[in-house]
């Protein structure tokens, strides 16, 4: 049903009021993608792109939206929040049922919470207790990825680039069995942006909320190791029984899951858990649709939930991370003093991932011990290996495709397809144009990255966008916005 211009105008005024009351950052996080879908007979339906946004807005902002709309239309009876594209992939075939599951021991349930900090990402199996039965050892070992006690919701720095993912993670951790689940919840971001922090915070908070809950946190590599070891030791059935009896499965670094048989077992596991209304949370360095090493049915199942991106932290978030890190360091050394001027400078200069920021702070701590009067110029010398002042950031075509697709609300698959509808052609041409002006890639190389197109197609797109932007101020502003987003988030 077409929406009247009157309803659109009312909606625009409501959005303006929302932004004024809540601030631009909160508005952008929760309401930036709202659209009025229908307005008739006192009922207004507002659409959002995900079930998570619908649930969050219903739970936190529906009364405010209704109040603001009633100021525009006293005849309003009801506001409904609906999902624009609520498609969900079902299972393609019934999976064979495993033998009845056995209950995991209390030791297994809480092995995570007692885990020590691991110096690296390669997990090692716990040392078996002398004299313990083989099956008991196996059950104890199933939760082999330890939690880092530093990774909690309280120590996570929230901001515009991760606010939605943070809210979803808290909702999952704090939900009861009857609560709305975002299932599976899929978090994706490049390295060092807080995925592992959020996943471990979910596990820790879930155990805190319900100590009897059965929580499994492990990396994809550890999952592969466990299954390979179980198959070698003829314990595969025992492992499957343990895993099917859990309440919350959390898998990190999904992009490393390799092997047809391992992927088959993983797909079978998440199908079983999801069909049993058990929560699954997964993280990777890219969206499910771009995990090309995964079998199509695994990608399909992961695509059936809520996928949320976490992007690079802004200045305020980086400064918050540094201040939190300093406060933690002062617990061990109360005399430690790093000025606000230095923290501000580092936050402005180190613009990459949280890991780079952590490395910069560790350098500061080390130098502070024998250079207490350290200067800004000296800091630039010390941190030269972390940042290069004036060095242009390298932008990848994949980053441009991802950010342009998100901006125009299309998928990367559509961007690379042969579809010729206007809603796809314009974003595709914009992405080709930006690939030409923001990367050193040749026209033939750009064409190959866009679904194997000929270089003349790319040249046509570049020239068309150049011509249009010269006469269309709106398009010129869009291109400038996209350039900033790409430079900030690539």
From Swiss-Prot:
* Chain positions covered by the region annotation Domain II: 75-145
Q: Which InterPro entries match?
A: AAA+_ATPase (IPR003593), Chromosome_initiator_DnaA (IPR001957), Chromosome_initiator_DnaA-like (IPR020591), Chromosome_initiator_DnaA_CS (IPR018312), DnaA_C (IPR013159), DnaA_dom (IPR013317), DnaA_N_dom (IPR024633), DnaA_N_sf (IPR038454)
Could you name the Gene Ontology cellular component terms for this entry? cytoplasm; plasma membrane
The record's family statement is:
Belongs to the DnaA family.
Tell where it localizes.
Answer: Cytoplasm
Q: How does it assemble?
A: Oligomerizes as a right-handed, spiral filament on DNA at oriC.
Which annotated residues bind ATP? Answer: 192, 194-196
Q: What is known of its domains?
A: Domain I is involved in oligomerization and binding regulators, domain II is flexibile and of varying length in different bacteria, domain III forms the AAA+ region, while domain IV binds dsDNA.
Function as written in the Swiss-Prot or TrEMBL entry: Plays an essential role in the initiation and regulation of chromosomal replication. ATP-DnaA binds to the origin of replication (oriC) to initiate formation of the DNA replication initiation complex once per cell cycle. Binds the DnaA box (a 9 base pair repeat at the origin) and separates the double-stranded (ds)DNA. Forms a right-handed helical filament on oriC DNA; dsDNA binds to the exterior of the filament while single-stranded (ss)DNA is stabiized in the filament's interior.
Q: Which CDD domains match?
A: AAA (cd00009), Bac_DnaA_C (cd06571)
Keywords, in A-Z order: ATP-binding, Cytoplasm, DNA replication, DNA-binding, Lipid-binding, Nucleotide-binding
Q: Name one GO molecular function term.
A: ATP binding
Tell me the leader sequence span: none
Using the UniProt annotation, give all residue ranges assigned to the region (Domain III, AAA+ region). Answer: 146-368
Task: Indicate what this protein is called per its UniProt record.
Answer: Chromosomal replication initiator protein DnaA
Biological-process GO terms, alphabetical: DNA replication initiation; regulation of DNA replication
UniProt-annotated stretches for the region Domain I, interacts with DnaA modulators: 1-75
Identify the coding gene.
dnaA
Record region (Domain IV, binds dsDNA): 369-490
Task: Specify where it is mainly localized.
Answer: cytoplasm
């Amino acid at each position: 049903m077409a929406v009247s211009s009157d309803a659109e105008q009312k909606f625009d005024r409501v959005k303006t009021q929302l932004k004024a009351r809540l601030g631009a950052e909160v508005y952008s996080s929760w309401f930036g993608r709202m659209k009025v879908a229908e307005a008739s007979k006192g009922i207004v339906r507002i659409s959002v792109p995900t079930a998570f946004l619908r649930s969050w807005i219903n739970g936190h902002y529906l009364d405010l939206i209704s109040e603001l709309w009633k100021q525009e239309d006293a005849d309003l009876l009801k506001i409904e929040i609906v999902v624009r594209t609520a498609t969900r992939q079902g299972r393609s075939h019934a999976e064979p049922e495993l033998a009845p599951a056995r209950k995991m021991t209390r030791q297994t349930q809480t092995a995570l919470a007692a885990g020590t900090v691991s110096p690296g990402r390669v997990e090692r199996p716990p040392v078996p207790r002398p004299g313990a039965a083989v099956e008991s050892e196996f059950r104890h070992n199933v939760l082999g990825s330890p939690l880092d006690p530093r990774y909690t919701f309280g120590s996570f720095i929230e901001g515009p680039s991760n606010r939605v993912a943070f809210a979803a993670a808290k909702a999952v951790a704090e939900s009861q069995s009857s609560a709305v689940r975002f299932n599976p919840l899929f978090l994706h971001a490049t390295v060092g942006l807080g995925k592992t922090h959020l996943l471990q915070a979910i596990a820790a908070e879930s155990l805190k909320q319900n100590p009897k809950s059965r929580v499994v946190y492990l990396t994809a590599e550890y999952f592969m190791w466990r299954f390979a070891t179980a198959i070698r030791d003829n314990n595969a059935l025992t492992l499957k029984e343990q895993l099917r009896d859990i309440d919350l499965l959390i898998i990190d670094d999904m992009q490393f899951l390799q092997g047809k048989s391992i992927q088959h077992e993983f797909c079978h596991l998440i199908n079983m858990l999801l069909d049993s209304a058990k929560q699954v949370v997964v993280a990777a360095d890219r969206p499910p649709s771009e995990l090309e090493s995964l079998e199509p049915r695994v990608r399909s199942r992961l695509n059936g939930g809520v996928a949320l991106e976490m992007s690079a932290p802004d200045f305020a978030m980086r400064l918050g991370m540094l201040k939190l890190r300093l406060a933690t360091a002062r617990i061990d050394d109360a005399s430690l003093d790093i000025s606000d001027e230095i923290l501000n400078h580092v936050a402005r200069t180190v613009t990459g991932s949280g890991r780079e920021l952590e490395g910069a702070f560790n350098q500061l701590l080390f130098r502070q011990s024998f250079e207490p009067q350290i200067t800004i110029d000296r800091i630039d010398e010390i941190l030269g290996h972390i940042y290069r002042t004036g060095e242009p950031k390298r932008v990848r075509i994949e980053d441009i495709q991802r950010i342009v697709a998100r901006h125009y609300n299309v998928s990367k698959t559509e961007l690379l397809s042969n579809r010729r509808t206007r809603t796809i052609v314009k974003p595709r041409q914009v992405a080709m144009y930006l690939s030409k002006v923001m990367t050193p890639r040749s026209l033939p190389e750009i064409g190959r990255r866009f679904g194997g197109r000929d270089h003349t197609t790319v040249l046509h797109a570049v020239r068309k966008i150049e011509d249009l932007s010269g006469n269309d101020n709106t398009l010129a502003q869009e291109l400038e916005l996209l350039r900033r987003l790409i430079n900030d988030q690539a």
